Amino acid sequence: MFDQKQKSLALEFARSLSKRDYRQAYNMLNLNAQSQWTEDGLREQFESMIPLDWGDIDPIQLEENPAWDEMFLYVVLGGDSYSEAIIVNSFASDDEIPKIDSFQFGRP
């Protein structure tokens, strides 16, 4: 089960990406995830999912479901025509600060 700090971090990560603040989003990743991603990589993947002409990304919210709550956090990124998502699979701590260790873009 994910705790409230982890849920808040997943939401803040999605909000940072939605604001196109890739540096802030990158800094929410732990060292392992940072070794696999760059700020430009985050931008490219996010903008291939949600292009610049998408419009407002609203709502940004956790969708909870007992079937998957033990496995991952599902953050909905709402749009006018359809929604997308960010799935956060795991967290780790760097110097006792919770960070995102593994995530993926897009709906399953």
Named regions from a protein language model:
Residues 54, 59-108:
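Exposed beta-sheet edge and beta->alpha loop/turn motif
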Residues 17, 26, 30, 76-78, ...:
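Generic alpha-helical secondary structure signal
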Residues 3, 14, 47, 92, ...:
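Compositionally biased, low-structure terminal segments
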Residues 1-15, 19:
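Short, low-complexity N-terminal intrinsically disordered segments enriched in polar/charged residues
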Residues 8, 12, 23-66:
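Short solvent-exposed beta->alpha transition segments
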